Structures are given as structure tokens and as C-alpha cells.
């Protein structure tokens, strides 16, 4: 499309109140599993999820990048759901990748598409880094979610 107007996209679930926008004059990011813009309306509860790495509950960290990404996404889902939110409430991700490459981008993009589908996903920034907190840690993903408040609910 060559229109200059922003193109709102349907939300990932019928319950999501967020507006996902991929302006047609920008690169279409959906193949990489993210959206350019997510608009969330107040009143809402904000949820900030700390960076989730590829370690399991016992602290074991696999060597393979794809295994770490899969575990990090599983950890992220568990953390988001523990707050009472769901993946459809996530509006922003930051992904840190050690030794970033096109091959690693493909793994991350595939994991994001698997979690959010081919249509809509949160806004996302991927940052290549030289090192993360733990020896052998290759990926870390943090999230911000916005959960609309029911009428009369408190933040």
C-alpha cells in the first residue's frame, strides 16, 4: 500500500482493546513478529515484566540459541499470566540478543509469530548486545502489558 494513513489492524483477540497500527509507508513488520505501533487506552493497569532468559525453573540454561528463545518465551508467558494479563495485553517487547545475526533474527521472529500469530504482535525493539547477565545466556526478553480496568476497578 502507498497510502499515507495509518492502517489499524484487527487485534489478536476479540477481547483486546488495543489498537495495532502498521503505517503503510513503513516496512511491514508482521513477518518478523511485531507491530510498529500499539495504542492502549486508559484507565488501565500497567504490567512490567523483567527480562526473561532461557533458563528453566532450576536455573539450567541450554547451550542452543533456539532452545533459549523457546524457554525465554515460555518464561515470559508464565510471568505475564501470573500478573493476570495475557499475551494479548502485551504492548511492548525488548529483545536482547548476544552475537546477533540474520539466523538468530529468524529464530526470534519465528518465536514471536508462534506466540502472537501472523497478524498482530506487540511493538518490539531487538538490541544486539555483547553479553547478558549469566555466562552462556544468549537472549533476554522483557515486556510491558496494559490491562484495561473493568468499570469501577482500581489501578
Task: Give names to the regions the model predicted.
Residues 1-74, 78-91, 98-155:
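N-terminal presequence-like segments and the immediate start of the first folded domain
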